[in-house]
Every structure is written in C-alpha cells, then in structure tokens.
Amino acid sequence: MRSAKLKFEKRRSRIRHKISKTSNRVRLSIFKSGRHIYAQIIDDSKSITIASASTLDKKIKKFKKSHCNIENAIKVGEEIAKKADSAGIKEVVFDRGGYKYHGVVKALADAAREKIKF
C-alpha cells in the first residue's frame, strides 16, 4: 500500500498535468504548511508570479495566532482576488496543489471566486 506522501505527490502531478495541457490561462496555486496558507497567481507561459497573498501578510497576520484556519483562508482569498483584479486578471485556473477541496482550500477558493472567474 502506498504511503500518504506518495499518494499526495501523484495527485499533485496529475492535477498539474491536466492544468498545463488544457489551459492557456494563468493559474491560482495554493500551498498549505502546518501554520500558514499561501496563494499565488502564476503565468506559466512567462514563468512569473503575478500576484501573491498569504497569512504572513501584515493585513492578515494581525488577526489570529492560528494562521491556517478558515477565517484567515477567506481573508487570503479576498486579498488574492483584489490583487488579481488590480493586475487586470479576470479568469484563472484553480490549482489546488494535491490538497482535497475541503476546509481551508474550499474557503480560499470560494472567497477568491467572488471577484475572479474559475
């Protein structure tokens, strides 16, 4: 039986491959650590990061000690949507990065979806 880490890596590579072969849009990539959550809008054709937001940002960091929770994920989603809107980005592809679409990932996506079309 495969370990959880191998399953995660396989799921991540499968998702990334589907996104890269089917879409020419920029992608909204999510990363979760044990304490923080990060979101980036990446243009793979130019290999640049257009916008980023995380729980390490001063606007979000001042709210709670526990940083990787649903309330802060919503704030990160709103912040990345605001930065994308100011950069002129209207559509992205959501790259959940191998994480299950549940909890903080879902909260971040729903908050970002208010201003950005997925």
UniProtKB/Swiss-Prot annotation:
SUPFAM superfamilies (UniProt xref): Translational machinery components
The record's note on quaternary structure and interaction partners says: Part of the 50S ribosomal subunit; part of the 5S rRNA/L5/L18/L25 subcomplex. Contacts the 5S and 23S rRNAs.
Q: Which UniProt keywords apply?
A: Ribonucleoprotein, Ribosomal protein, RNA-binding, rRNA-binding
Q: Which family does it belong to?
A: Belongs to the universal ribosomal protein uL18 family.
A GO biological-process term: translation
GO cellular component terms listed in the entry, alphabetical order? cytosolic large ribosomal subunit
Q: Name one Pfam family in it.
A: Ribosomal_L18p
Q: What's a Gene Ontology MF term here?
A: structural constituent of ribosome
Q: Which domain of life is it from?
A: Bacteria
Relate the protein's function as given in its record: This is one of the proteins that bind and probably mediate the attachment of the 5S RNA into the large ribosomal subunit, where it forms part of the central protuberance.
Organism whose genome encodes this protein: Rickettsia felis (strain ATCC VR-1525 / URRWXCal2) (Rickettsia azadi)
Q: What is this protein called?
A: Large ribosomal subunit protein uL18
Q: Which HAMAP family match?
A: Ribosomal_uL18_B
